[in-house]
């Protein structure tokens, strides 16, 4: 079978952010045109613009942040193609938390890969040590029963700001920072016996949140200098023109 070697430089244009010219971190894609950027770069750009930075198509006239989504597949590809990028990003996050004197979340305490890996000089492929494979299998079993309790946690207060819906009996919840707004919509819909979670909008500071926003992202971008808990409001979905 014939194989063809491709230099990383040849595909850089497909795995870098047009806004910062660096490799994609927390890859986020515009749903309208499928162009991808670093999440922090795109969110900052959309604070003053409503068009795609690449093709200039209008994402949405008033709420462009609702039409972007985390692209896990693209981020996985970038991490696999660029040696050491994921480990470097994890290290930067740990240093960030240490600098602020905050506890490092459980999901980034260790190295990005739980197994010890080395690069095969013959073909550039990554291989894991046998002992690490055994340790990884045992750790995975423990993680399966963890239910994200070791993740960074976020305290939330869910308030209803519409007379058309009732309030939750227990409006205070605590969950993983990796949970998304979509998870909250499903939770509220189940508690209120709604026919569909798509009937809801969730807001922070009177701004509608995109369904793919993680709670960590919401805290960092909308609640950074405010005290816990994170205050969110829910209401019946309003169609935006």
Curated annotation (Swiss-Prot):
What molecular functions are annotated in GO for this chain? histone H2AK119 ubiquitin ligase activity; zinc ion binding
Q: Name one Pfam family in it.
A: zf-C3HC4_2
Q: Which SMART domains match?
A: RING
**The keyword Magnesium appears for this protein:** no
CDD domains recorded: RAWUL_PCGF3, RING-HC_PCGF3
GO BP, sorted A to Z: random inactivation of X chromosome
Q: Segment Interaction with BCORL1: which positions?
A: 131-241
Description of the deletion phenotype: Combined disruption of both Pcgf3 and Pcgf5 causes embryonic lethality; there are no live progeny. Male embryos are detected at 9.5 and 10.5 dpc, but are smaller than normal. Female embryos are already extensively degraded at 9.5 dpc. Placentas from male embryos have some parietal trophoblast giant cells, but fail to form a labyrinth. Placentas from female embryos lack trophoblasts altogether and fail to form a labyrinth. Defects can be attributed to the observed lack of monoubiquitination of histone H2A 'Lys-119' and lack of Xist-mediated silencing of one copy of the X chromosome.
From start to end residue, where is composition biased (Basic and acidic residues)?
117-139
Q: Where is this region: Disordered?
A: 115-148
Location in the cell reads:
Nucleus; Nucleus, Nucleoplasm
Q: What does this protein do?
A: Component of a Polycomb group (PcG) multiprotein PRC1-like complex, a complex class required to maintain the transcriptionally repressive state of many genes, including Hox genes, throughout development. PcG PRC1 complex acts via chromatin remodeling and modification of histones; it mediates monoubiquitination of histone H2A 'Lys-119', rendering chromatin heritably changed in its expressibility. Within the PRC1-like complex, regulates RNF2 ubiquitin ligase activity.
Assembly mode: Component of a PRC1-like complex that contains PCGF3, RNF2 and RYBP. Interacts with RNF2. Interacts with CBX6, CBX7 and CBX8. Interacts with BCORL1.
Q: PANTHER family under this entry? A: POLYCOMB GROUP RING FINGER PROTEIN
UniProt name for this protein: Polycomb group RING finger protein 3
């Amino acid at each position: 079978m014939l194989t063809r070697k491709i230099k990383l430089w040849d595909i850089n244009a497909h795995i870098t952010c047009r806004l910062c010219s660096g490799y994609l971190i927390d890859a986020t894609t515009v749903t309208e045109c499928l162009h991808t950027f670093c999440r922090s770069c795109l969110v900052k750009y959309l604070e003053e613009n409503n068009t795609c930075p690449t093709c200039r198509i209008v994402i949405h006239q008033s709420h462009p942040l609702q039409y972007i989504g985390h692209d896990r597949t693209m981020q996985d590809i970038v991490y696999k193609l660029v040696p050491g990028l994921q480990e470097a990003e994890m290290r930067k996050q740990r240093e960030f938390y240490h600098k602020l004197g905050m506890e490092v979340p459980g999901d980034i305490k260790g190295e990005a890969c739980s197994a010890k890996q080395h690069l095969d000089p013959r073909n550039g492929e990554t291989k894991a040590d046998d002992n690490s494979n055994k340790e990884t299998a045992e750790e995975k079993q423990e993680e399966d029963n963890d239910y994200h309790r070791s993740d960074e946690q976020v305290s939330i207060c869910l308030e209803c700001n519409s007379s058309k819906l009732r309030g939750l009996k227990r409006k205070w919840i605590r969950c993983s920072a990796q949970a998304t707004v979509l998870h909250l919509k499903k939770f509220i819909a189940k508690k209120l016996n709604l026919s569909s979670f798509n009937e809801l909008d969730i807001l922070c500071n009177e701004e509608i949140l995109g369904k793919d926003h993680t709670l960590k992202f919401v805290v960092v971008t909308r609640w950074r200098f405010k005290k816990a808990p994170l205050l969110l409001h829910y209401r019946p979905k309003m169609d935006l023109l």
